[in-house]
UniProtKB/Swiss-Prot annotation:
It is an enzyme of class 3 (hydrolase). The gene is ffh. Coiled coil: none annotated. The lineage of its organism: Bacteria, Bacillati, Mycoplasmatota, Mycoplasmoidales, Mycoplasmoidaceae. InterPro entries: AAA+_ATPase, P-loop_NTPase, Signal_recog_part_SRP54_M_sf, Signal_recog_particl_SRP54_hlx, Signal_recog_particle_SRP54_M, SRP, SRP54, SRP54_GTPase_dom. Part of the signal recognition particle protein translocation system, which is composed of SRP and FtsY. Its EC number is 3.6.5.4. The keyword Hydrolase applies. Involved in targeting and insertion of nascent membrane proteins into the cytoplasmic membrane. Binds to the hydrophobic signal sequence of the ribosome-nascent chain (RNC) as it emerges from the ribosomes. The SRP-RNC complex is then targeted to the cytoplasmic membrane where it interacts with the SRP receptor FtsY. GTP binds at residues 106-113, 188-192, 246-249. It catalyses: GTP + H2O = GDP + phosphate + H(+). The keyword Nucleotide-binding applies. It comes from Mycoplasma genitalium (strain ATCC 33530 / DSM 19775 / NCTC 10195 / G37). Keywords: Cytoplasm, GTP-binding, Hydrolase, Nucleotide-binding, Ribonucleoprotein, RNA-binding, Signal recognition particle. This is Signal recognition particle protein.
């Protein structure tokens, strides 16, 4: 999210201990300067940066310290607290009132229509409740068609009335909503390239007709500082209740988008973390603060795993692995489940900075996993369950190569690395029994 992790700046520029009784301006001057540069480089709003730096300075300079106290840890704790303060606002979670009426607004290209579908999917998964999706973008027929497709994919009710005035369509949608056995209605309003009075008047007419519980602006995570003025215009006319930041799975610096909560005092409710329908997550200020600091987001990673893996199956697979009995069938299922959690790159971003892997290496890992899946899928079930059969029989290897369209050396590398993994897993199992650290060097296989 931010190119320069704030924790690495602190570690690099600030000495661990000082002998004085209080922290002085000089002790923190360099680190605050570099943090300021990092935040501005990430497109965080200047006013937000100034307030952030001032808050850290006020809380650290003059602070009484114990002899030998670790200043780095102390400063990181203060930075994290202030980051959470910037990102946090009251009513952070989506309104739990039912029936729930949501009005979605935003600029063209922000991912608003796609986000409507993701939100319907998120509500269904989280609350097991049905949603009605209403197409009000009468200026872009493709948007209404897209919303209809999304409604089919999310098992939602779809409503639209072509090019009818949006207020009239909203009124008709509300009538249909009352009899549709849906708990939530989401109105996808027209996106524009820029704000103007005509657009705002139209949105106000929808608001007056719908009387929404939530007015959510979808903001592109790639947006620059101009999004702040746009959001202020929307908020002035509509009184926004929240933001959804889209495209946070990209290399977006996202500083401008994340500045909105502090500047407008409006909460960020959800974030888009992938292009898939399940790529919407609740916004947790503390977790985002951890990512910015380079401390990772292990809680979100655990939640993703819990959604994908069956606990009993996972326990069984891990037990087989440590006993050296995990076969290629188990590995294939495991890789398929991992794929459901997201790309290797997106998962690595949730790990602390000291576990970081470059984008290039993440891509290599992704490619290797896809290659292995192709090769393993070209094996018979008997071969997957008894990999030694492949090494013993050249004819089996030839058949797998022919079926997969891959090269012999790629299959040989898979089998060689598989054997290494089996040996390493067995060693790990033995180390676990003795209470030693079993994970040293295991990552080399990917």
């Amino acid at each position: 999210m931010f190119k320069a992790m704030l924790s690495s700046i602190v570690m690099r520029t600030m000495q661990k201990k000082i002998n004085a009784q209080t922290i002085t301006e000089k002790d923190v001057e360099l680190v605050l300067k570099e943090i300021r540069i990092a935040l501005l480089d990430a497109d965080v709003n200047l006013l937000v940066v100034k307030n952030f730096i001032k808050a850290i300075r006020d809380k650290t300079v003059g602070q009484t310290i114990e002899p030998g106290q670790d200043l780095q840890k102390s400063l990181l704790k203060t930075i994290k607290t202030e980051l959470i303060n910037i990102l946090s606002q009251p009513n952070q979670e989506l309104n739990e009132k039912r029936p729930l009426k949501i009005m979605m607004v935003g600029l063209q290209g922000s991912g608003k229509t796609t986000t409507c579908g993701k939100l319907a999917y998120w509500l269904e998964k989280k609350y097991k409740q049905k949603t009605m999706l209403v197409g009000l973008d009468i200026y872009r027929p493709a948007a209404i068609e897209q919303l209809e497709t999304l409604s089919q994919q999310t098992n939602s009710v779809f409503f639209a009335q072509g090019t009818q005035p949006v207020a009239k369509t909203t009124k008709a949608a509300l009538s249909a909503f009352k009899t549709a056995k849906c708990q939530t209605i989401i109105c996808d309003t027209a996106g524009r390239l820029q704000t103007n009075e005509t657009l705002m008047d139209e949105l106000v007419s929808v608001k007056n007709e719908l009387n929404p519980d939530e007015i959510i602006m979808v903001v592109d995570g790639l947006s620059g500082q101009e999004i702040i003025n746009v959001a202020q215009t929307f908020h002035k006319r509509l009184k926004l209740t929240g933001f959804i930041i889209s495209k946070l799975d990209s290399d977006a610096r996202a500083g401008a988008a994340l500045s909105l909560a502090s500047l407008l005092q409006v909460p960020i409710k959800l974030i888009g973390v992938s292009e898939k329908l399940d790529g919407l997550e609740q916004f947790h200020p503390e977790r985002i603060a951890n990512r910015i600091l380079g401390l990772g987001d292990v809680m979100s990673l655990v939640e993703k795993a819990e959604q994908v893996f069956d606990k009993k199956d996972l326990t069984k697979t891990i037990s087989k692995m440590f006993l050296g009995k995990m076969d290629l069938e188990d590995l294939l299922i495991y890789m398929q489940q991992m794929h459901k959690m997201g790309s290797v790159s997106s998962l690595i971003k949730m790990l602390p900075a000291n576990f970081s892997v470059s984008e290039e290496n993440a891509e290599l890992i992704e490619n290797k996993i896809e290659l292995w899946k192709v090769l393993i899928n070209s094996m018979t079930r008997e071969e997957r369950r008894h990999p030694k059969l492949i090494n013993r029989d050249p004819n089996r290897k030839q058949r797998i190569i022919k079926g997969s369209g891959r090269k012999m050396d790629e299959l040989n590398k898979l089998m060689k690395e598989w054997n290494k993994m089996q040996l390493k897993a067995t060693e790990m199992g033995k180390l676990l029994k003795t209470g030693s650290n079993p994970f040293g060097g295991f990552g080399q296989f990917f």
